[in-house]
């Protein structure tokens, strides 16, 4: 990629400049001015000359188009829940710098990093307000100066640090890759982040070879499915994959040799049963205590590759306890331990490779070749409209997806909007019913607690009455003894 660290921010800055420069030109159209006073012949001549001088130049004729140019964008307005990502309309045509292209976006990819970014846990996303999204696919609509290898009409997939969740993006041409023949826009949007991540971890770090074993966590997710497919391009690789039981059939068909239900089984024990000596490669997106477990599962010459901290994510808003717990349990190892164990630990973060054009190009070229050969193919879980981004994020965060979740820039049809509004109303009604049930249960529980307290009071009174009766009996006995 180029050295442009934040093309999305530059784009927003250009839009702001355009709006600022347009304001003086637009204001005369909206202002109402008083009738001019009578003018002399010389004044009229001067006015005529001024009017001639003010005749719009050809460049100014573009202003109406730029004024009417609008596009929709998802904007992270602040850190928090799903409602913090809002669909907004931007005005003004983004300006192209030398070496840049404008892409009309068709599809966008949703990644786990986007969920973390929404909670303020992903440091490669600029501060809000900002448009998230690291990948998209679309058609080149305009080309800047010094761009020789791209042209208007080219179908491309785009990998960028941020700013991809909108209908129009401006990026360095080096951030774009031509789509192979037969690739859909959905597949193109699903490919860059997941497949480059999986490829570089397995082959650049892991040096995956025949007859080796790999542990893939979150095997039903985007990176998990990409990693599994890439493992199957090497002969006799054994893949252990963690996923909930309902996803085992799909991931087994995709190439996972030994699916493990992490919710009901200890994956460490399951791996040890099948591979007592351990594993050659562990891909760890979880962090915390799971990194310790992964390291201990390595056989001699094994490699642990850490590429995330998904354990920090608990709920749609930042959970400080989960963050603190994961951070506290974060893995650290002494070099002496590495030497004695003959193991290695690697860290991978695609977001910090955005200026490493050659590395990214090599990985993308290899992945594209494998796609053309039919050896890898993104699995699309579901597609949501930009208006439904909250539902899309919820599906991923609740781990309900099997494969990639895609956002389409195609506007929702009126019937779909009505259906969506109906669903929202049903959700609200369901929530009200749930809240009412909870309130009723609380009231019922409170009544039961009060009834129990009353029962205890009655029992206590009975006990005290018994004690009093006993004391009275004892006194009577004492009186009788004294009388005798």
Curated annotation (Swiss-Prot):
<dbReference type="GO" id="GO:0005741">
    <property type="term" value="C:mitochondrial outer membrane"/>
</dbReference>
<feature type="compositionally biased region" description="Low complexity">
    <location>
        <begin position="40"/>
        <end position="61"/>
    </location>
</feature>
<feature type="compositionally biased region" description="Low complexity">
    <location>
        <begin position="1"/>
        <end position="13"/>
    </location>
</feature>
<dbReference type="GO" id="GO:0008270">
    <property type="term" value="F:zinc ion binding"/>
</dbReference>
<feature type="region of interest" description="Disordered">
    <location>
        <begin position="402"/>
        <end position="484"/>
    </location>
</feature>
<feature type="compositionally biased region" description="Basic and acidic residues">
    <location>
        <begin position="411"/>
        <end position="484"/>
    </location>
</feature>
<comment type="similarity">
    <text>Belongs to the zinc-containing alcohol dehydrogenase family. Quinone oxidoreductase subfamily.</text>
</comment>
<dbReference type="InterPro" id="IPR013154">
    <property type="entry name" value="ADH-like_N"/>
</dbReference>
<protein>
    <recommendedName>
        <fullName>Synaptic vesicle membrane protein VAT-1 homolog</fullName>
        <ecNumber>1.-.-.-</ecNumber>
    </recommendedName>
</protein>
<dbReference type="Pfam" id="PF08240">
    <property type="entry name" value="ADH_N"/>
</dbReference>
<dbReference type="GO" id="GO:0016491">
    <property type="term" value="F:oxidoreductase activity"/>
</dbReference>
<dbReference type="InterPro" id="IPR011032">
    <property type="entry name" value="GroES-like_sf"/>
</dbReference>
<dbReference type="GO" id="GO:0010637">
    <property type="term" value="P:negative regulation of mitochondrial fusion"/>
</dbReference>
<feature type="region of interest" description="Disordered">
    <location>
        <begin position="1"/>
        <end position="65"/>
    </location>
</feature>
<keyword id="KW-0560">Oxidoreductase</keyword>
<dbReference type="InterPro" id="IPR020843">
    <property type="entry name" value="PKS_ER"/>
</dbReference>
<dbReference type="InterPro" id="IPR002364">
    <property type="entry name" value="Quin_OxRdtase/zeta-crystal_CS"/>
</dbReference>
<dbReference type="InterPro" id="IPR036291">
    <property type="entry name" value="NAD(P)-bd_dom_sf"/>
</dbReference>
<dbReference type="InterPro" id="IPR052100">
    <property type="entry name" value="SV-ATPase_mito-regulator"/>
</dbReference>
<dbReference type="Pfam" id="PF13602">
    <property type="entry name" value="ADH_zinc_N_2"/>
</dbReference>
